[in-house]
Amino acid sequence: MKSNPPRSSLEACKAAGQAPQQKTQAKPTKAARQKVLVTGGGGYLGFSLGSHLAKSGTSVILLDRRRPQWELSPETKFIQADVRDEEALYRAFEGVDCVFHVASYGMSGAEKLQKEQIESINVGGTKLVIDVCVRRRVPRLIYTSTVNVAFGGKPIEQGDEDSVPYFPLDEHVDHYSRTKAIADQLTLMANGMPLPGGGTLRTCVLRPPGIYGPEEQRHLPRVAGHIKKRLFMFRFGDHKARMNWVHVHNLVQAHVLAAEALTTAKGYVASGQAYYINDGESVNLFEWMAPLFEKLGYSQPWIQVPTSWVYLTAAVMERLHLALRPICSLPPLLTRSEVRSVAVTHTFQIAKARAQLGYAPDKFRFADAVELYVQSTTRRPRGSTARTLLRLLLRLLLFLGLLALALHFLGLQPLHAAVERL
């Protein structure tokens, strides 16, 4: 993808992409207050983005199915609605200057196996958001995508927007990545659509990796829960496998800059563009998670397990979850796509975002986010080595028994082709 040159420094997301107001001899006219809407505004990223914009003087609407767990500021309005509800979107988008489409479903855990829900929200919801943006004459749309539109299990080292294509849709092992890739493309294809009565819809997409930061509610608590249950006593994958992460503060910065870069004041530099966004560093997941193990009072994983075993286990867990879903909830410890994410290097450059958006990520430490997290949890003492080994042995025997039963009753194939690639 090619982009328009020159850009300027960071400003607040206030330029509305409209013709500048004419000055008069009388007292100056005050600029109209910017009005933005954030879908998925009840989630961690959506709420953080909305809060930042509200502090800068922007009128903010947060739209989500669930109310945020954090307190709303006076400058923020919350609308409880679903992105699949066209009438609700049409009412909410009235007078909006910019839409940040953050809402999605199926990122991790058992959610990744809810195919119908994932499809209807990630693809169907995005189609409706684009359609209502046009009908309501919203000039700017920023879509929060994911690095998974390009990563599907094959190594990527310092990939960029031009050299790394979309991963083939039919080769994704999870529906979340597939539907996010479709929504990513739909958003970019919508760029340049004419608006009723004049004007043009300008769109761009941001592709972040996993998010961390204070009060993050998905990745850190889930891993911490597994650690406390002694489910993470092994490690897998190449010790050299690396990935990116992004602090919520940096991702919010990128969204604000992207919205600004879709205005006439910035020459529409981001129009029709995609950007990888991360902290500018690559890490090995197990090394990066070391502060979490330490702060919780548990030993780091020390048993190396073949990735093929873990991948097969994940496949069995997925099958068991689907088979038992009508009876009980049995969320998988890991899914196949998560195993690939941990075991296979996939890192991306942020040079394009730096050059075109003026993106300049601040430095953060995962250990600081861990420190805030453990302050609200009870530190558990380390167990003795003998007791730990006994627990591990019992769990291993139980797992092997369940694996044998699952393979027998579910008729699961060995997944040779997929396993050999890991």
From Swiss-Prot:
Catalytic activity, EC: 1.1.1.-
Statement: the UniProt record of this protein carries the keyword Oxidoreductase: yes
Binding of NAD(+), residues: K180
A biological-process GO annotation: steroid biosynthetic process
GO molecular function terms listed in the Swiss-Prot or TrEMBL record: oxidoreductase activity, acting on the CH-OH group of donors, NAD or NADP as acceptor
SS bond partners: none
InterPro entries, A to Z: 3Beta_OHSteriod_DH/Estase, Lipid_A_modif_metabolic_enz, NAD(P)-bd_dom_sf
UniProt-annotated stretches for the region Disordered: 1-32
Active site: Y176 (proton acceptor)
Pfam families xref list: 3Beta_HSD
Family membership: Belongs to the 3-beta-HSD family.
Protein name: Putative short-chain dehydrogenase/reductase family 42E member 2
Designated gene of the protein: SDR42E2
